[in-house]
């Protein structure tokens, strides 16, 4: 019975994430804002960058809130915020209006939803199945991008205002009933780590393994959101391909697939090794991308990048749970998610380099160097052993 309830929660979480995952198609919306309203590339990209910052910042608050109030209330609140943000953006179609409403308010709503459904689903499963369960839940966002890319392209064809309106109604109608199915298991949650962490938020920030995870999440998600933001333009510049939404959909499809694959692989070979493998795949794909000159070639490389990028959203929450326990998982994962907000700097730098150089090769080289650095860092990552020195303090050292 518990397994059935667990998968029901996981699938409901997948549905919520599917609806929340509209930002993965932002590059198409940005093109519409530029072509229809005359926004500059920086203006069109800025709401997404602000979304990343607000999303990651509010993940901390949402995670702590759901740890205490439960995931159902927080997810429902998130759905209402998402719908309101999209609907209101249709009536305030200025760079400042969309940035404030879609960037900040939508980011808060997304944090409430994503920060609640993943922890809730994970608590229903044993350690051996947490990677797979996490992969199933976060796959919703990847599938969303695959479906939303052509849908948003179609809606933007009728005007960005109409696109915001229709998407807003979708969110209001869709998230609320699914949120009613999101709940924690009764009684004690399944154990995750050998010695669960009870450190407070400022203590967790001093743990070496957490700092390493934050840096790795920063670089790798920053790499991914660079493609989410600029892929439509990259297709036109490097492959003379005007139907960039097809590459966006390809990236999204493999993004979704990567989440399931990463869950299965990490359950089998371990979290740290799976991370090293994922980062290495990203590095190799970026090296090949330097030579991209045709839609087919670029499509293959983008698919591999999407596969690796999707894996991040399975590997990192599963690793946080395995390393630090689930008692305060929402808070800990929220703190890690601030790295995604910092990763919003990467697409801004890529846009700046594109404006100076006329292509994205300089940005690709920057990402290659950064990914090589986190591969080395991942080789040093080991599961911590945690011992309580007192009620207030925890001492962490690496397993010998």
Regions found by a protein language model. Give the residues of each.
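Extracytoplasmic gate region of multi-pass secondary transporters
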Residues: 26-31, 208-264
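Interfacial helix-cap and linker-helix signal at transmembrane-aqueous boundaries
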Residues: 33-34, 65-66, 150-159, 235-236, ...
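Conserved MFS/SLC helix-loop-helix module at the cytosolic interface between two early adjacent transmembrane helices
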Residues: 57-95, 266
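Hydrophobic core of transmembrane alpha-helices in multi-pass small-molecule transporters
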Residues: 97-112, 297-310
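Intracellular juxtamembrane helix-capping segments at the cytosolic ends
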Residues: 112-125, 311-324
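Helix-loop-helix hairpin linking two adjacent transmembrane segments in secondary transporters
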Residues: 137-183
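Flexible cytoplasmic inter-helical loops of multi-pass small-molecule transporters
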Residues: 183-199, 388-397
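C-terminal transmembrane helical hairpin of 12-TM major facilitator-type secondary transporters
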Residues: 249-255, 260-261, 266-319
